[in-house]
Amino acid sequence: MPRRPRTTHWVRYISSVVLFFLLILQGVPASAVPMQNDPNGFEGIPWGATFSETDSFMKVQDAGQSQTYELKAGTPSLGPVKVDSMRFVTSEGKFARVTVRYQGKATHDQILAYLQSLFGPLDRTPGQIASGPVKFFSWTGLETDVKLRYEIGTNLGIIFFESQQLRRKMTDSSSDTVF
């Protein structure tokens, strides 16, 4: 009976070690924090509301079941913080998601403070905050999920405010709305 070469054992060992370190370097998602004040929508617009072009919103993308809108006037802001873009997404004509993009460490810190003031503080227990080149933060309510992803190396952030009920209907084929 032929004997396996010893290199197979070392290859497995080294592969396991490399995989372990790659997983650590990717950053571990922070646990979702229960949302203290679920807004059941975004800035006064309830999830599931009929949404169309108005004086305030213009359609920028139509993907059949999903339409994407942006604000017509001014620089978008999340609370007091100016952001690069804010897109409002519908599923079958019903308001379902907002995608916010921003850049810069100072902007990230302001947004994180603002979101914590709205939805509750993050769990600062060791091991609960993401480390590595990508940080994830999440608040989960009964009707709303808020997920923030921030890349330290590029200082780019993206936030999703989503209706839990309408999330399943969303088409994630559009790169503008994919996490």
Where are these regions (language model features)?
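Non-cytosolic coordination micro-motifs
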Residues: 3-5, 32-71, 99-179
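Short, surface-exposed beta-strand/loop micro-motifs that present aromatic residues
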Residues: 85-88, 148
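Bacterial N-terminal signal peptides
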Residues: 15-26
